[in-house]
Every structure is written in structure tokens, then in C-alpha cells.
């Protein structure tokens, strides 16, 4: 996509596009977009304020049924301020886990907007906590122009009552939101063996990369990961949740804040990774009505 098209995209999102003056744009790469005079521009980026979740969905790509933990607010702010000196995302998402479980989410939203004044900010939530959301978070969502993506995971009367109560709260406050029907498009990020433990696929890396739609980088532990899903897998393996079958993920090296501009661009330009082989070549969709049951039924700390 040429520079003019990117400007048109930002304008359609209600954002100014002076960011792209004197910018070389490479839209055909899923992560790397281009560079301006000071920072590298990327298409999608996310953070996980918490990996804990109030749901226990089977085949969750974040392994949140088994992992838990919340990033301290000052630590998350430090990550954002550090990396904002090097990169500018067009789209920046707060995911997890369930981000509304973070006790100071409003501070994280405020700092993110201060770091990236023209970036589209999006909060991903399963919606069940929206009806009880703190006023401070609502006010932060509004003043920082944060859009909300509500993921609907199940479809039964009791769940729907709670879910749409949260959606109604967004309507009342005039917050921009959209709904993702995860109950219709939920797929397996991994397989389960005879012991009900997660095991990776054994795919052709190029084929898995080609069909992948989750090409979103993530900042975690003050490092930049090329792929959010890969970041989850690495952390879960390091925590002992995943077995030795996942060791190939550990070969990936995320970027640290002391990387050079050239190293950053090269990292975002690399395309298919050998580690892509742990993901499916073709997604298998399921109905996410079954909760995850781990053989040991225990949680592991995600953040050390």
C-alpha cells in the first residue's frame, strides 16, 4: 500500500496522518509498515496487562486456563514509554487474559495514549465484567478514544444475559465497540494429547504462516516479540505448562530496547519463522462450550 493509501486508512479511522510525512511505507509486510524520521512504524501491536482470565475456554491461545499473573502498573508503563521511543503502531491493543482484571488499567490506557497520540487504541474483553466496570476505567476509555472489541465466547441464556448487560453499558456511555462472534469462529491453537495436555501441530512453517491471521507483535517483559501467539507459547514453556514438544519455540529471540534501528527493521521484515511449524496449516473450528480441564488442575505464574 502506498503512502497515500495509508493516509486514507488513518483518515477513515478519524485520525490525523501527519505521522506519515517523509515516510517510506511497505504495507505488504504484516508487521513492518515503514519509517519516519525518528521511529519505526508497524501495523499491529499489543500488550497483555494480565494473563489471568475469568473464563476457562478450551484451546485458548493465551493458555489462560493454566496461566495467571498481572503486570505491575509501573512496570507496564516503563515498557510502553521505553518502546514508544522506537516504534509507532497504527493499531495498539490491550489483550490478555482479560484486561479488565487489571487493577489500574486506566493508568495503562492513559500512558498508551500519551505515548502514541494518533494510534488507534483497542481494548479486547469478553464483556462479562463490563457491567461492573470501574468509573475510572470508563472515563479513561472515553478520554483516550479507546475502541472496545467484545468477544462473545458462548451462547446460552445465562451467559447472554451477562454479556449483553455489558454491551448495554458501552452503549450508555457512547463508547465505540464491535462484537466478535468467537462462539462461531473459535479454533484450536494447539492439539491435546491422551493426557489432555497441549501439544503443538507439526506443520510446514510456510503453509502455517500463509494462513495465519494472528500476525500481531507484542511487548512483554520489555521485549518485542514478532508474534503474540509465539510469545504466549514461549512464556508457557518457560513456566513449565508446556512440555518438551514445544522446545522449538525457545529458539526465538525477541528484541530488547537497546536494539538498533536497523536490527528492528530487519526483525520485522523476516516473514515466515521456523517456529511457525507449531501452528496449524489449516484451522479447525470448534464450538467453545467445553471448559479446559488440565490433568493436574493447577495454575502457573506467567510473570515470574
Regions found by a protein language model. Give the residues of each.
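Conserved alpha-helical substructure of the radical SAM core
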Residues: 12-14, 20-133, 298-304
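Conserved AdoMet/S-adenosylmethionine-binding subsite of the radical SAM
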Residues: 102-221, 225-230, 235
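Boundary detector for helix-to-coil junctions that initiate low-complexity/charged tails
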Residues: 1-12
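Accessory C-terminal segments flanking Radical SAM cores
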Residues: 194-304
Amino acid at each position: 500500500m502506498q503512502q497515500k493509501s495509508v493516509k486514507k486508512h488513518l483518515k477513515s479511522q478519524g485520525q490525523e496522518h501527519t505521522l506519515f510525512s517523509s515516510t517510506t511505507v511497505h504495507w505488504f509486510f504484516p508487521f513492518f509498515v515503514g519509517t519516519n524520521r525518528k521511529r519505526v512504524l508497524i501495523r499491529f501491536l499489543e500488550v497483555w496487562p494480565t494473563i489471568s482470565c475469568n473464563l476457562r475456554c478450551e484451546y485458548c491461545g493465551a493458555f489462560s486456563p493454566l496461566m495467571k499473573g498481572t503486570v505491575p502498573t509501573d512496570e507496564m508503563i516503563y515498557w510502553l514509554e521505553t518502546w514508544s521511543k522506537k516504534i509507532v503502531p497504527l493499531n495498539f491493543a490491550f489483550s490478555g487474559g482479560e484486561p479488565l482484571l487489571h487493577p489500574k488499567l486506566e493508568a495503562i490506557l492513559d500512558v498508551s495514549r500519551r505515548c502514541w497520540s494518533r494510534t488507534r487504541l483497542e481494548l479486547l474483553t469478553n464483556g462479562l465484567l463490563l457491567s461492573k466496570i470501574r468509573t475510572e476505567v470508563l472515563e479513561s476509555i472515553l478520554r483516550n478514544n479507546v475502541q472496545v472489541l467484545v468477544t462473545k465466547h458462548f451462547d446460552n441464556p445465562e451467559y447472554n444475559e451477562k454479556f449483553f448487560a455489558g454491551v448495554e453499558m458501552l452503549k450508555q456511555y457512547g463508547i465505540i465497540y464491535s462484537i466478535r462472534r468467537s462462539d462461531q469462529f473459535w479454533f484450536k491453537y494447539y492439539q491435546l494429547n491422551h493426557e489432555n495436555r497441549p501439544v503443538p501441530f507439526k506443520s510446514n512453517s510456510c503453509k502455517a504462516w500463509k494462513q495465519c491471521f494472528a500476525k500481531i507483535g507484542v511487548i512483554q517483559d520489555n521485549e518485542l516479540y514478532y508474534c503474540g501467539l509465539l510469545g504466549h507459547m514461549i512464556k508457557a514453556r518457560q513456566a513449565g505448562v508446556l512440555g518438551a514438544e514445544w522446545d522449538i519455540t525457545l529458539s526465538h529471540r525477541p528484541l530488547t530496547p537497546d536494539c538498533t534501528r536497523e536490527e528492528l527493521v530487519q526483525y520485522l521484515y523476516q516473514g515466515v519463522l521456523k517456529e511457525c511449524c507449531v501452528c496449524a496449516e489449516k484451522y479447525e473450528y470448534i464450538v467453545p462450550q467445553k471448559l479446559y480441564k488440565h490433568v493436574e488442575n493447577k495454575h502457573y505464574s506467567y510473570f515470574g
